[in-house]
């Protein structure tokens, strides 16, 4: 209850801008950073917590930083950060140590009957999904953005076997991704195949469904 009520954020910020960029920490982010830096003043930036360090090193200040990790591993993404202007939007599933650590935050209740029973309507409700890119996208939708660009959302390993972008706090080959069953799927635009794992593939399917369900609200 110490966080900024989500409904207040909506009342103050909804439909103020049309263009949003959702930034994730996939391997392709590295090559997209120069363009993002050049256009950072042309759009509102939603940053997955894992990509925060990469943006900070380029002098890019995101408007929103999202997190929904139920473990405290994400503490590393926020430690020793100079940025105090971004609004940290956290899921109700976010680990309590991170909730207490961060200032300028809004803890948002998931769009679920279980949470609606608490009658804390000022702090809800949003479809947070199962990963931060989903959360960032639905947050941008809730704020009324009409054009939402997704970058760094590979959901696949690159040709060198990297799971994350250069500069990721846990390394480009994050060990947490190595022991999950792998499979090959068609690459973006159907150009060949890429290696992914079952969790990422599930994220991809859910994201594609999310985009399709909201194609009248926002262009992807």
Where in the sequence are the language-model features?
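Metal-ion/cofactor- or nucleotide/acyl-coenzyme-handling active-site neighborhoods
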Residues: 1-46, 53-220
